[in-house]
A protein has these predicted regions:
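Conserved SAM-binding loop of SAM-dependent methyltransferases across substrates and taxa
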Residues: 88-96
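N-terminal auxiliary segments of SAM/dcSAM-dependent transferases
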Residues: 1-39
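Short beta-strand element of Class I
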Residues: 100-102
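Conserved small/polar residues in nucleotide/adenosyl-binding loops
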Residues: 104-110
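Short, aliphatic-rich beta-strand segments
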Residues: 42-48
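Class I SAM-dependent methyltransferase Rossmann-like catalytic core
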Residues: 48-58
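Conserved alpha-helix/loop element of class I SAM-dependent methyltransferases that forms part
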Residues: 60-75
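Conserved class I S-adenosyl-L-methionine
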Residues: 76-83
Length: 110
């Protein structure tokens, strides 16, 4: 039997991804957290049924959210990242020697 994750955008549109295995599933105090292993996108993180990131394309989001502002604000030194997620934004910020990075995020339940 095939296993698919579907994200519903409108009543007439959904995006589906074939899943090899569900790696994690938990309802936290804040949201439903699921992690899937997929053949096309690698690991996929969903929150409340919405895709947040995939291994295959996370760099696109992280690079754009970091390097565009850093190019505009060349004197940035102290940076606070709220909602650090997978750590990709923090990873990209560490490419800049001049910055000190602090971050915070919700802790996943154990």
């Amino acid at each position: 039997m095939e296993f698919w994750f579907s994200e519903f955008h409108t009543p007439d549109v959904k995006h589906s991804i074939r899943v090899n295995k569900q790696l994690y599933s938990k309802q936290s105090d804040y949201q439903r957290i699921d992690i899937f292993e997929t053949p096309e996108f690698g690991r996929v993180l969903t929150l409340d049924g919405n895709v947040m990131l995939t291994e295959r394309d996370e760099f696109i989001y992280d690079e754009m959210i970091v390097h565009v502002p850093m190019a505009v604000h060349r004197e940035a030194k102290d940076i606070l990242v709220i909602g650090a997620g997978d750590g990709g934004v923090v990873r990209e910020l560490t490419r800049y020697d001049r910055v000190a990075v602090s971050y915070t995020h919700l802790t996943l339940p154990t």
